[in-house]
């Protein structure tokens, strides 16, 4: 699992990422919206870089959920049982832009957490049928 906003940022970066203090940061860092998938080797090599510096790695990831964070992505299924499910996922997953300081910010963590939770709810309850 990859933390989009690194869990090891400098104290001076808390405000730049939209956090009031260290406690505010700790309350957000492990939310579902701050996680994505990367292979262990990619995760290790990306280290504690800022979000703006991770985007190219995300674009080249084998994981579509990680690609879409960095660039728009569509997966079209024209017919079949999974058409509505794929359309739901495409509609709910968004591309994100670093804040003015290059971070995946507190606001983006909150937004993406809500979006991921909504998508999971709709998938698990089959609300897309």
Regions of interest found by a model, annotated:
Residues 1-129:
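Flexible coil/loop and intrinsically disordered segments
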